[in-house]
């Protein structure tokens, strides 16, 4: 006995739908790494969508799960080069499985564990990185065109330059009142940065490219970490803590400075990517002496950033 295919019947209201699919599909993703015996492991959630024509009542959602599982098997065997490639292959295969769809879209949100070493005591610790991937496949003259993106959000520390300069002026006035020689004052400020209020900064970088290009996730994380006042660690011995605090206050940065530094590092790090590569950069600083957060953002193509930076 054949079962009725209700999804293939005509809907009562005949309009097309932009997105139909499933959200928050939890999967363990293992991506093989060249030269490594163990794969990179991502604890992930997927959102998977197709568009739906006005002639169909519903989409066959079980096909989405079949495609995801098939591609995850490829990833474990090393046939997939990165998490954006996972999304790209899924989006392309969805077009094969949903013959009525012209556009498919896949989102992936993951936790990625990285091993770290503290700067002074060399203590081993781990850090959880939020990583993201996205892909869109579109039928163009019968051939699917795929656009992919990969990104990460990294936490660091920033120190406010404004408050630091206020404290420096105050300290200089006190030293002058104590009749400390000018050369001694200059020597002190060269060695010891002044206090300031701090922020926990969250930097985000996303790189969007065409189908066959893979952007190393580790390079994205490095750009983000190097763009704030200092890196932070889950575990710090006293020597490490002193180092981090000193480093942050010797490198005080506004939220705007962080985004501009990210842009500079993106151009120098990913200079081999095509000019039409889309870059999204943003920084959120959670203020310690205010109740609000500070925020800055830049969206541009790589070519536009190169032109502005004259690189």
From Swiss-Prot:
Enzyme Commission number(s) of this protein: 3.5.4.39
Broad class of enzyme this protein falls into: hydrolase
Keyword Metal-binding attached: yes
Cofactor requirement: Fe(2+)
Reactions catalysed according to its record: GTP + H2O = 7,8-dihydroneopterin 2',3'-cyclic phosphate + formate + diphosphate + H(+)
Entry superkingdom: Archaea
InterPro entries linked: GTP_cyclohydrolase_FolE2/MptA (IPR003801), GTP_cyclohydrolase_MptA (IPR022840)
Pathway assignment: Cofactor biosynthesis; 5,6,7,8-tetrahydromethanopterin biosynthesis
GO molecular function: GTP cyclohydrolase I activity; GTP cyclohydrolase IV activity; iron ion binding
Subunit-structure text: Homodimer.
Similarity-based family: Belongs to the GTP cyclohydrolase IV family.
Protein task: Converts GTP to 7,8-dihydro-D-neopterin 2',3'-cyclic phosphate, the first intermediate in the biosynthesis of coenzyme methanopterin.
Protein's name according to its UniProt entry: GTP cyclohydrolase MptA
Gene this protein is translated from: mptA
């Amino acid at each position: 006995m054949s079962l009725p295919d209700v999804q293939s019947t005509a809907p009562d209201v005949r309009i097309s739908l932009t997105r139909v699919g499933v959200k928050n599909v939890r999967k363990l993703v293992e991506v093989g790494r060249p030269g490594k015996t163990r794969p990179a492991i991502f604890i992930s959630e997927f959102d998977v969508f197709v568009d739906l024509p006005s002639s169909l009542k519903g989409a066959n959602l079980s096909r989405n799960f079949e495609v995801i599982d098939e591609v995850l098997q490829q990833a474990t065997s090393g046939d997939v080069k990165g998490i954006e490639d996972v999304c790209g292959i899924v989006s392309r295969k969805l077009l094969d499985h949903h013959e009525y769809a012209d556009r498919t879209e896949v989102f992936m949100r993951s936790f990625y564990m990285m091993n770290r070493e503290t700067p002074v005591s060399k203590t081993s610790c781990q850090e959880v990185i939020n990583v993201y991937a996205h892909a869109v496949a579109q039928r163009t003259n019968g051939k699917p065109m795929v656009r992919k993106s990969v990104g990460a959000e990294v936490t660091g520390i920033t120190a406010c330059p404004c408050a630091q300069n206020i404290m420096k002026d105050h300290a200089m006035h006190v030293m002058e009142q104590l009749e400390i020689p000018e050369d001694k004052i200059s020597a002190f400020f060269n060695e010891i940065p002044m206090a300031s209020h701090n922020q926990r900064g969250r930097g985000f970088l996303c790189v969007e490219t065409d189908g066959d290009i893979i952007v190393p996730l580790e390079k994205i994380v490095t750009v983000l970490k190097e763009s704030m006042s200092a890196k932070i660690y889950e575990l710090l011995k006293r020597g490490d803590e002193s180092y981090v605090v000193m480093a942050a206050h010797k490198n005080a940065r506004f939220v705007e400075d962080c985004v501009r530094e990210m842009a500079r590092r993106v151009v120098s790090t990913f200079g081999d990517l095509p000019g039409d590569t889309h870059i999204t950069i943003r920084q959120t600083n959670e203020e310690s002496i205010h109740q609000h957060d500070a925020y800055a953002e830049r969206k541009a193509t790589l070519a536009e950033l190169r032109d502005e930076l004259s690189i």
